[in-house]
From Swiss-Prot:
Gene3D superfamilies: Spore Coat Polysaccharide Biosynthesis Protein SpsA, Chain A
Family note: Belongs to the MobA family.
Protein residues bound to GTP: 8-10, 20, 66, 97
The protein, known as: Probable molybdenum cofactor guanylyltransferase
BP terms from Gene Ontology: Mo-molybdopterin cofactor biosynthetic process
Binding site for Mg(2+): 97
PANTHER family: MOLYBDENUM COFACTOR GUANYLYLTRANSFERASE
Main location: cytoplasm
Length: 193
């Protein structure tokens, strides 16, 4: 299956107080905890400008800024940039602040890829998880439309797509895997969730 991992690391991290992607947790940057659990495929990192040097120093080669015309427009801008610049059928889009996700969950999610849907999104504890989801390349026109219409919420995009919702039971996932980190005290000291 033709899939590229897309890690979104372009946010301002206002509540966290510093860039989350580079925050050291248990001896390595937060983004590395996420990256090691993604599909065994190429990973493209969509970076905040202030982190470009950091990622390059960590040996990351596929690190891009959002395309200039959509820079600052949130996750949709990152998805747009990845789809415009890296050809693939599917994109596993994830945030850099979900360090408890498991590769098994990513693999289970990818097993639902089908030509009959545009996106495969987990539903965990009654909430959609659009920032750990698979999007087909054919979503690009809908993403472009959302950006042009200044509809920047993920729910705006989801309403335009044929979506396969996958429950946490179908993924054999735990709800804690999908916790995103907004403040330092969201990270347990011992790494256990």
């Amino acid at each position: 299956m033709d899939v590229v991992n897309v890690m979104l690391a372009g946010g301002a991290s206002r509540r966290f107080g510093e860039p989350k992607a580079s925050y050291m947790y248990q001896g390595k940057p937060l983004y590395e905890h996420v990256k090691k659990q993604l599909l065994k495929r190429q990973t493209v990192i969509i970076s905040h400008p202030s982190l470009l040097t950091f990622f390059k120093e960590r040996g990351e080669r596929d690190v891009w800024l959002d395309d200039e015309q959509v820079r600052g427009y949130g996750p949709l801008a990152g998805m747009y940039t990845a789809m415009q610049n890296k050809e693939a059928a599917w994109y596993l889009v994830t945030a850099c602040d979900m360090p408890f996700i498991r590769r098994e969950t990513a693999e289970a999610l990818s097993s639902y890829c089908s030509e009959h849907v545009d996106a495969i999104i987990p539903l965990v504890q009654g909430r959609l998880q659009p920032l750990f989801a698979l999007y087909h390349h054919r979503c690009l026109p809908a993403i472009d439309a959302c950006l042009k219409e200044n509809q920047l919420a993920m729910k705006d995009l989801i309403q335009k797509l044929k979506v396969r919702i996958v429950s946490e039971e179908e993924l054999n996932a735990t709800p804690n895997e999908f916790r995103n980190i907004n403040k330092r005290n969201d990270l347990p000291e011992n790494g256990m969730i």
